[in-house]
Amino acid sequence: MDKMWSGRFSATASSLLDQFNASIMFDRKLYREDIEGSIAHATMLAKQGILTTDELSQITKGLSQVKEEIESGVFEWKISDEDLHMGIEKRLTAIIGDAGKKLHTARSRNDQVAVDFRRYVLRKNLEIVDALKLLMNEILVIASKHTQTLLPGMTHLQHAQPINFAFHLSAYLSMFKRDIERFESSYKRNNISPLGCAALAGTPHKIDRDMTAELLGFESASINCLDTVSDRDFALEILFNISTMMMHISRLSEELVMWSSYEFRFVELSDEYSTGSSIMPQKKNPDVPELLRGKTGRVYGSLMGLLTVMKALPLAYNKDTQEDKEGVFDAVETAEISLEILKEALKTMQVKPHYMKNACKIGHLSATDLADYLVQKCDIPFREAHFITGKAVAKSEELKIDLSDIELKYLKEIDDRINEDVLAFLSIENSMNARTSAGGTSTKRTEEQLKYFENFLKAE
């Protein structure tokens, strides 16, 4: 018999069709989930009296042998078997005989692959969460050392207001916390079992879907079989979650690339996580963050690809959804190595506070503080204070100095209401620590934020 479904066909499938139709060379990644799902299904069938105890024992032992063969590398994956389900079932039947032919009772490949793929995605949601926690812990280690390290905060990539380096890193902790929450939310929402839905409409066999759901670690069985066998929201969600996470990684990577340049010198990546040039001997290139930026686009492509596959599929299952796996596999693997290498690159990175502080003396970072002084101390409306401060900035430009270094006499020429106490407002350090509102950049508020993220990770 050529194919397990070949009964109604009079001709053998062409080798070209085998090559085009087969998914076995990539969906075999799901062999653990497939074997575990089959054991759970067989266990339920035996409890329901559809299989005998002896048949269950044969199937369980046979599947264990198949698993050992796969993991030892002796299992032969054949294109002609079409997919891993058929490959494993054919090998099982070759080992144990007729009992293997009974395994597929009350089951379709439609619900079988939905179980396998869903369980893989659920597992990867949690593994990525664990990797994100490790990354956040590493960022916390760095941030805890730099709550007083001055850094120019920017908008439009222009110097805006002074902040501290830990506060800047805390912004990424916020992003990665949201990523964790998205993965965890997806896990909870999608933790339902498709097993027993069969092709699309359930089965007349007296099965127990709740039993298999419990055996496989699902929260419950799904509600509607028609939806369940064709649902790939769980795959789209992990792709979206990874895409969003990679976007956050890419933003940090962009800053690492800039900060490691001679124009900034805020950080230096270690030799272990840098590369050189084939022609320019002096080069030390930030290939890790550059590749992280590039791989973000690759993950986006997987998300858009699956969205496009799914956008016009009628209910229920269609072969189009075979195209769901490679993009997810690739995105997951990209996410895993990206999180690991970013963590290690940060761990070995050298922070250069001196250059960060020097950069705070460029761009008149205390301009807003002068405006605030005029409002608070001189009772000047903010819009007028904004205009006066602009004049002070222009004067500083004329003098070729930073606003934080301007002498009182020049400020009084602009507005005589300005007094000597303004100089404390213009201090870069004081400016950073003046922002004491909740979520602000003062050292005290930054330390509160770091404690918040530390507690978040402890509670997870």
UniProtKB/Swiss-Prot annotation:
Pathway where it operates: Amino-acid biosynthesis; L-arginine biosynthesis; L-arginine from L-ornithine and carbamoyl phosphate: step 3/3
EC number: 4.3.2.1
Gene3D superfamilies for the chain: Fumarase/aspartase (C-terminal domain), Fumarase/aspartase (Central domain), Fumarase/aspartase (N-terminal domain)
Subcellular location: Cytoplasm
A GO cellular-component term linked to this record: cytosol
Entry-linked SUPFAM superfamilies: L-aspartase-like
Enzyme category, top tier: lyase
GO biological process: arginine biosynthetic process via ornithine; L-arginine biosynthetic process
One function term, GO molecular function aspect: argininosuccinate lyase activity
Alphabetic keyword roster: Amino-acid biosynthesis, Arginine biosynthesis, Cytoplasm, Lyase
Catalytic reaction annotation: 2-(N(omega)-L-arginino)succinate = fumarate + L-arginine
A UniProt-annotated Pfam family: Lyase_1
Family: Belongs to the lyase 1 family. Argininosuccinate lyase subfamily.
Name used for this protein in its record: Argininosuccinate lyase
Naturally occurring in which organism (per UniProt): Sulfurimonas denitrificans (strain ATCC 33889 / DSM 1251) (Thiomicrospira denitrificans (strain ATCC 33889 / DSM 1251))
Lineage: Bacteria, Pseudomonadati, Campylobacterota, Epsilonproteobacteria, Campylobacterales
